[in-house]
Amino acid sequence: MDIQLKTGCFDDAALVRRVVFMDEQGYEIEFDQIDEASSCIHVTLYVDGQLAGCSRVFPEELERAADAEAPVSPACDMDEDVAAGETYIMGRVAVLPAMRRRGLASVIVEASAACARDAGAKLIKLHAQEYVLPLYAKAGYTQIAPVDYEDEGQPHAWMAKRVDGR
């Protein structure tokens, strides 16, 4: 299995997100202004040259600027010594149905964290669907708030991880 990761391939990421979040899971609002921001990093994963999954990471302040009603990440102990612009949000992690059960989501999560760290992140926060919390816990993320229903009524929880070695 030859795995390749790329950044900047929004059209491929959009295809995965449309299939997984809109067609499969029924979300109505999948794309936003964040997708168009130059500081938003779209990560795509390919297996043997075939599109398999995606994610995006971006500076936290971008979310507030794009949507005043977006869920707000809660403060946590990991925020200590993290300046404005050094907290990134990871989201839209998805793997196409035919490519699942191969550990690819873990690869995407790890690659996304590396991209955020390379862009200056010290802390990554994410608002994960409840059923995938174990995936992120295995990758070192800690739940920092109870489950909520702020994202189209679906159960999600905030998680965070320091990526600066602290």
Where are these regions (language model features)?
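Helix-loop element at the rim of GNAT/NAT acetyltransferase active sites that forms part
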Residues: L15-I29
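Conserved beta-strand in the GNAT
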Residues: T44, Q50-E60, A65-E80, T87-A94
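Conserved GNAT acetyl-CoA-binding A-motif
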Residues: V109, A116-Q129
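Conserved catalytic-core motifs of GNAT/GCN5-like acyltransferases
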Residues: K125-H127, T142-W158
